[in-house]
């Protein structure tokens, strides 16, 4: 096990995080195509150099640098105003499961550095890293898909937290949220999986890919653990 502060990485987590480094920077505001003069640019350069120089022979060292520079890039973007003003919403639903989808509703969940207590993924190949501790989705997006005829509902696609009344186009990598007692930072979009095909007409699960606009689920890193209850406030950029 590899640790960075409170975050624990398995060997597979290290490998997959390093393999995702460029994509994680691409997903940040101004990340693709990369803005050479943007707030994140100097941090990306250091992370990519560490990846090139140490990724194969000293992955622990590469991970430490990549993690630090990635988090610093998000901080720099926040300082530059990339994530906008505070917005207030609510926790509409909570979900956890023993693996796979759908997840099952809960009135309250306890969240640690590694995610929701009692929740697990059927496979960790594409899930379960510290920056994928929580999966969030918008009740308004779900409702729009349902209104279009897709048999989708909260928790069916595997999100832990369904929020309402937040501007989902601003819930992007690097944005921070206070959800109940938990503070988290959006890390990436959750790519659609064919296991979710049953929730979409003709199996067209790709419609929730972020390439189609602000419709994707998102992953988040836990910054402050705690309890979340249905009906709790969900605040985007709470310090703005």
Predicted feature locations:
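Electropositive, beta-rich accessory/interaction domains or terminal extensions
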Residues: 2-16, 21, 26-48, 61-179, ...
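Amphipathic alpha-helical coiled-coil segments
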Residues: 53-55
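Short, basic/aromatic beta-hairpin or loop at an interaction surface
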Residues: 150-160, 201-216
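Short amphipathic alpha-helical patches
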Residues: 168-169, 210, 231
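Short, charged, solvent-exposed linker or helix-capping segments at domain edges/interfaces
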Residues: 197-198, 232
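Well-ordered alpha/beta subsegment
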Residues: 217-240
């Amino acid at each position: 096990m590899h640790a960075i502060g409170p975050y624990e990485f398995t060997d597979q987590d290290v490998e997959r995080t390093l393999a995702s480094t460029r994509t994680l920077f691409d997903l940040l505001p101004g990340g693709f195509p990369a803005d050479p003069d943007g707030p994140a640019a100097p941090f990306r350069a250091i992370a990519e150099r560490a990846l090139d120089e140490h990724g194969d022979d000293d992955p622990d060292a590469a991970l430490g640098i990549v993690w630090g520079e990635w988090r610093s890039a998000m901080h720099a973007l926040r300082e530059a105003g990339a994530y906008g003003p505070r917005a207030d919403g609510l926790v509409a639903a909570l979900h956890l499961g023993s693996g796979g989808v759908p997840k099952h509703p809960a009135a309250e969940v306890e969240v640690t550095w590694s995610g929701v207590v009692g929740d697990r993924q059927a496979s960790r190949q594409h899930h379960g890293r510290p920056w994928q501790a929580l999966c969030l989705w918008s009740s308004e997006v779900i409702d729009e898909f349902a209104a279009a005829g897709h048999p989708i509902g909260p928790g069916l696609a595997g999100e832990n937290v369904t929020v309402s009344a937040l501007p989902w186009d601003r819930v992007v990598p690097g944005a921070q949220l206070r959800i109940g007692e938990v503070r988290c930072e959006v890390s990436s979009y959750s790519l659609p999986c064919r296991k979710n095909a049953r929730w979409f007409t003709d199996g067209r699960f790709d419609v929730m890919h972020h390439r189609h606009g602000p419709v994707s689920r998102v992953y988040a890193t836990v910054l402050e653990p705690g309890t979340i209850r249905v009906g709790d406030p969900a605040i985007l950029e709470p310090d703005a």
